[in-house]
């Protein structure tokens, strides 16, 4: 007798066929049921985040394509063989508190330009990029200039303006290897297209540095100065490398057989060795008759006054930029990750303003551009001047001991120790060069932070009234 009662349920032909395939009957008898509570929570949360992420990226692509369709007809205009495309100069500065100095440039490339293939051009400080939508749709080229440290961008802008002024006044030759009418015409056309292209400034820090460089470039004289040489002359009289005075209790008999110590008058000036350093050139006795050619030639740009008015300047595209740095801002970082469409729309609108070429006069209220971004600076940035002064104090506190060791070894007053043989201490010449490099770095950091700190207002000159322009929103019916 069969111990198992027959299954009263009637089997369908499909089920019978599946049983003959070798599938266990227990699998076929299993009925679907809801997952456990924990699995339901996990699946719900995961699918919610995935769905929101997919929706955000879909909207981002849709927004970008919308603005590309608005301007792509501009690329259909014919361009002559000797013409240049419209060129935009993009300025980006280091975000205070972030060691990554290129964040602003990457923000511009990702949201305003969407560039994917960088090409180096003009050294490590300047980069050109092959454009993708929206600018390539409008046949616009661009160049990014980024400052690696605070103040680099202001110095770059000021030096570029001074170079243009010197060339315009005939103090320097134009940057042409073989001047010709054709080359001159091409240069003028390129300069005109660059002026028409405009200038994009990314973020509050870059805006402050750009305006500071603009003021320095148009108000300072055109004298060419070697910054290292100027700083070396300033450091000559600080006394850190002066020879200590001879002790009055030391008799001359004790120095009869010893190597004479150099007096301060016999020492070379306190300056680092260089191409024209007195440490590398022989010292000549002074001539009893002054030579008329001994005095250095005066730079003709020293006496050039600043212009009474400014020439037309490229219109400014002010691009808001906030870089979230720090653990306290992690919630905002997460929110931005799932709401990237807002950045995409802001970048597309900024590019749309530039492409449309609709500008308005610069107003005083524009000086408050992106002022709210300064509230996201790390609190530690307020101690930058204190940190610089602390590093300077510690360095000069340890300098006398290093200098005494270098002089004692160079004069043979004592034998080097085992550690000094394995790792020779720096010589006096190396200490001078190191001090010059550190002082240049400290002073540049102090000036740079002073130009971008939240307490510092944006530079302004009354001569800029009516000269500077800002790209504005175009009329809505223009592109419809």
Task: Go through each PLM region and give its residues.
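Short, flexible/disordered secondary-structure transition segments
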Residues: 60-62, 74, 78-81, 142-145, ...
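Beta-sheet entry/capping signal
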Residues: 87-89, 141
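Mature, function-bearing regions of proteins
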Residues: 58, 67-86, 105-106, 125
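Single-pass hydrophobic alpha-helical transmembrane segments typical
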Residues: 17-73
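Non-transmembrane interaction and regulatory regions of membrane-associated proteins
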Residues: 97-115, 121-480
């Amino acid at each position: 007798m069969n111990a198992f009662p027959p299954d009263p349920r009637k089997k369908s032909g499909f089920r019978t066929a599946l049983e003959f395939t070798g599938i266990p009957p227990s699998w076929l008898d299993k009925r679907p049921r809801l997952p456990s509570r924990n699995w339901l929570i996990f699946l719900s949360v995961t699918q919610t985040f995935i769905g929101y992420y997919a929706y955000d990226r879909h909207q981002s692509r849709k927004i970008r394509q919308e603005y590309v369709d608005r301007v792509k007809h501009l690329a259909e205009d014919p361009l002559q063989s000797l013409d240049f495309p419209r060129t935009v100069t993009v300025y980006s500065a280091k975000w205070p508190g972030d060691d990554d100095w290129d964040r602003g440039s990457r923000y511009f490339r990702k949201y305003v330009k969407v560039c994917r293939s960088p090409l180096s051009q003009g050294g490590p400080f300047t980069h050109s990029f092959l454009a993708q939508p929206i600018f390539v749709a409008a046949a616009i080229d661009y160049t990014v200039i980024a400052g690696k440290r605070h103040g680099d961008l202001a110095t770059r802008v000021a030096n570029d303006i001074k170079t243009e002024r010197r060339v315009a006044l005939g103090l320097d030759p134009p940057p042409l290897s073989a001047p010709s009418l054709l080359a001159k015409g091409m240069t003028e056309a390129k300069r005109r297209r660059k002026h028409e292209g405009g200038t994009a400034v990314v973020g509050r820090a870059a805006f402050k540095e750009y305006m500071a460089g603009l003021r320095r470039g148009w108000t300072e004289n055109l004298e060419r100065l070697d910054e290292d040489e100027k700083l070396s002359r300033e450091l000559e009289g600080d006394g850190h490398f002066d020879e200590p005075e001879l002790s009055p209790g030391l008799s001359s008999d004790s120095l009869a057989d010893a190597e004479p110590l150099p007096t301060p008058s016999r020492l070379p000036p306190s300056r680092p060795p260089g191409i024209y350093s007195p440490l590398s050139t022989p010292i000549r006795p002074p001539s009893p008759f002054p030579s008329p050619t001994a005095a250095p030639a005066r730079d003709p740009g020293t006496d050039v006054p600043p212009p009474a008015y400014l020439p037309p300047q490229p219109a400014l595209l002010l691009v808001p930029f906030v870089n979230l740095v720090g653990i306290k801002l992690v919630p905002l970082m997460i929110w931005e990750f799932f709401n990237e469409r807002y950045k995409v729309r802001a970048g597309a609108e900024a590019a749309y303003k530039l492409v449309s070429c609709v500008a308005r006069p610069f107003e005083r209220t524009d000086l408050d551009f992106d002022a709210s971004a300064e509230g996201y600076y790390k609190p530690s940035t307020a101690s930058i001047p204190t940190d610089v002064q602390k590093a300077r104090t510690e360095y000069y506190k340890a300098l006398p001991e290093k200098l005494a060791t270098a002089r004692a070894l160079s004069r043979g007053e004592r034998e080097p120790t085992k550690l000094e043989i394995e790792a020779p201490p720096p010589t006096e010449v190396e200490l001078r060069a190191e001090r010059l490099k550190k002082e240049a770095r400290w002073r540049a950091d102090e000036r740079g932070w002073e130009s971008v700190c939240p307490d510092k207002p944006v530079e302004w000159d009354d001569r800029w009234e009516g000269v500077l322009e800002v790209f504005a929103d175009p009329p809505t019916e223009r592109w419809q």
